[in-house]
Amino acid sequence: MYEVILKRFENPDEVRTFEKGKFELVRLGGMTIGRATYEPGWKWSLHVGQGARSCMVEHIGLVVSGRATAAMDDGRVIEMKPGDVFYIAPGHDSWVVGNEPYVSLHFMGAGQYAQNKPK
């Protein structure tokens, strides 16, 4: 039997909130997809990692709006903008660039990201 499942981020299965941002999750077909929404001034090491140097979650995603930087532990730095499809290996920090909120969809790593944050 074939099945169709429709979900929307307006009614997510889970929301992980933290200062200056949130990460909404939908689960379907054995997969977890996340939508990250970060306000200007958000930085992973300050607002999610709580002082940790690096995010150790592997990400594949798509930038919907805004801009963000990913800084790898080896010194490489990239800026992501709307329409970019990205892969980010473990061992990075990230922050919002500019005065516009940053929104991205995450197809890999969503289930592990910001797990210990209060709901």
Kindly label every feature range from the protein language model:
Residues 1-37, 45, 119:
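A short, N-terminal "cap"/entry segment at the start of jelly-roll beta-barrel domains
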Residues 13-15, 22-23, 33, 58, ...:
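Short, acidic/polar N-cap/turn motifs at the starts of alpha helices
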Residues 31, 49-74:
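Glycine- and acidic-residue-biased ligand/ion/polar-headgroup-sensing regions
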Residues 35-36, 88, 93, 98-117:
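A short hydrophobic beta-strand segment most commonly corresponding to one strand
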Residues 36-38, 61, 86:
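Conserved GNAT-family N-acetyltransferase fold
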Residues 42-43, 79, 112-115:
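A short local loop/turn or secondary-structure capping micro-motif enriched for an aromatic residue
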Residues 43-44, 66-71, 94:
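Short beta-strand segments in beta-sandwich/barrel cores
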Residues 73-92:
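Short acidic-glycine-tyrosine-enriched beta hairpin
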